């Protein structure tokens, strides 16, 4: 359910983007609704509403949610200010690479890698497995960032579809692969440091 809530702004962005632009008037102001700029405005507004509601309910947001919200406001704001979708195309790569940087930094900062801090309360695994899993997440975020960047600037008519459904598909595939990998190690002795091949 929480993952679906995070997906709402992106889904609304996609729906508005796919609409044929049509003139509208609100409070005496006329504008065109539909297309990339209306979709960007919808992304910003819906992100503020969704994460604002989550913050009021939980009194906090996860660091990843803060990063996503700030990136949406910055890159979405630049897109609308300069009327250039180039800024928005950089949002997904930058966010993914910042996530990769955060996961990588946890190998050197603190006593636990980031994936263990996130999932350690639910799973008991040897540290070597946690380390390998953390490296897999780093590789995943680096790949997603590169894939988003490549599609955004190579396939102009397809990048929004990929941003929504391609990224979602890659995440699902990665999570399934992670589940299969973890199933092999759930009964490992946490005191051991040598992972299975």
Curated annotation (Swiss-Prot):
It is a multi-pass membrane protein. Keywords: Cell inner membrane, Cell membrane, Membrane, Transmembrane, Transmembrane helix. The chain crosses the membrane at residues 36-56, 64-84, 90-110, 135-155, 162-182. GO terms for cellular component: plasma membrane. Signal peptide: none annotated. Pfam families: IspA (PF04279). HAMAP family: YciB. Belongs to the YciB family. This is Inner membrane-spanning protein YciB.
């Amino acid at each position: 359910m929480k993952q679906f809530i995070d997906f709402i702004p992106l889904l609304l962005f996609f729906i508005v983007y796919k609409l044929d632009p049509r003139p509208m008037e609100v409070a005496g102001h006329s504008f065109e609704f539909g297309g990339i700029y209306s979709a960007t405005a919808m992304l910003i507004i819906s992100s503020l509403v969704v994460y604002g509601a989550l913050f009021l309910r939980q009194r906090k947001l996860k660091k990843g949610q803060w990063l996503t919200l700030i990136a949406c406001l910055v890159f979405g704001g630049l897109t609308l200010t300069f009327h250039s979708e180039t800024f928005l195309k950089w949002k997904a790569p930058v966010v993914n690479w910042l996530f990769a940087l955060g996961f990588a930094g946890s190998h050197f900062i603190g006593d636990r890698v980031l994936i263990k801090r996130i999932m350690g309360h639910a799973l008991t695994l040897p540290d070597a497995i946690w380390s390998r899993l953390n490296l897999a997440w780093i590789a995943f975020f680096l790949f997603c960032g590169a894939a988003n960047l490549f599609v955004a600037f190579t396939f102009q008519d397809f990048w929004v579809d990929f941003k929504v459904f391609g990224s979602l598909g890659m995440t699902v595939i990665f999570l399934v692969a992670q589940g299969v990998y973890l199933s092999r190690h759930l009964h490992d002795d946490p005191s051991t440091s040598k992972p299975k091949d």
